[in-house]
A protein has these predicted regions:
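A short hydrophobic beta-strand segment most commonly corresponding to one strand
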Residues: 170-171, 219-235
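Conserved short histidine dyad/triad with adjacent acidic residue
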Residues: 127-141, 160-164
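Conserved double-stranded beta-helix
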Residues: 196-198, 231, 237-287
Length: 287
């Protein structure tokens, strides 16, 4: 008989999912796949493109292209994480069948409670974050539905309202829908606009798509698991954002996503057609 990974509050999950951030609880802190020795093993077999790491004593407003490397290899970084002042993420760990099974187990527990917004949980991905004490993850947002689960150590994630143009603009979301990097502009006068979520082992938080956030780790090594997915809502939202970006080029001020269902459906059809035309126009590769 399988053990539940989440402590589900059905009313909270159904009522708040994707509408606002909220705290969750989980039972994964002792899971063998999420302990440092197993993660060291995983980091050495993942493709290099699936491991991102850098110095972690960063400002909240760090620009992506200026992010300093730590001068170490992947293996050195994860083995010395206690002292090397670094931040690391193991991306798409579901490539490994054991981690894929864990991801699916987690999301199948969530699925029955979010079907009104997300009938299907698609494009499932899992990420493991391993950070030195006092590491900072700069201000950024992500385009997926996300549940961040704290496994080891403590951190504070400060999350902002994606509907507030003072913290993220429609133009930034439109750029991300085309694949722009996740880091966003940040100024000190935005600090009071965020909501801090302190996370200890067993704690977690739901981060709705495109809600900006930044993270500061406590006095010990931190390990966190993110289980993420896309939905019909997220796919439609990204399509509308891409079409809106194109409309701006013609001087049109478009209606943001999720404010008009028929507009969003129409924009999704336009986005699909434009994607087909662009793919057809690409020169065929020669072998």
């Amino acid at each position: 008989m399988s053990t539940s990974h989440f402590v589900i509050d059905a009313a909270r999950l159904a009522g708040r999912f994707e509408r606002e951030p909220f705290a969750v609880r989980h039972q994964l802190t002792a899971h063998a796949l999420l302990q440092l020795p197993r993660l060291i093993e995983l980091a050495t077999v993942l493709p290099e493109s699936s491991v991102e790491y850098n110095q972690a004593d960063l400002p909240i407003e760090q620009e992506y292209l200026a992010t300093p490397r730590n001068g170490l290899t992947i293996d050195q970084t994860i083995r010395q994480i206690e002292d090397c002042k670094s931040w690391m993420v193991l991306k798409n760990v579901e490539r490994d069948p054991q981690y894929k099974a864990l991801l699916d187990e987690c999301l199948e527990e969530i699925a029955p409670h979010v079907r009104t917004i997300s009938p299907q949980l698609e494009h499932r991905e899992a990420f493991v974050f391993i950070s030195s004490p006092q590491a900072v993850t700069p201000y950024h947002c992500d385009p997926e539905h996300n549940f961040l689960l704290q496994i080891r150590g403590n951190k504070v994630m400060t999350i902002f309202d994606r509907g507030d143009p003072r913290v993220i603009s429609e133009r930034h979301m439109e750029a991300m829908a085309f694949g722009a990097h996740r880091n966003l502009p940040y100024t000190e006068d935005m600090a009071a606009l965020g909501r801090p979520f302190p996370l200890a082992p067993g704690d977690g938080v739901h981060v709705p798509m495109y809600c900006p956030h930044w993270v500061r780790v406590g006095q010990a090594v931190s390990i966190s698991l993110s289980v993420t997915f896309r939905s019909l809502v997220s796919v439609r939202r990204d399509a509308a954002l891409r079409v809106n970006a194109r409309l701006r080029r013609f001087g049109i001020s478009p209606v943001p996503p999720l404010q008009s269902s028929w507009r969003d459906h129409a924009k999704q059809a336009v986005d699909r057609a434009l994607g087909f035309v662009e793919r057809a126009a690409r020169p065929a590769s020669r072998g």
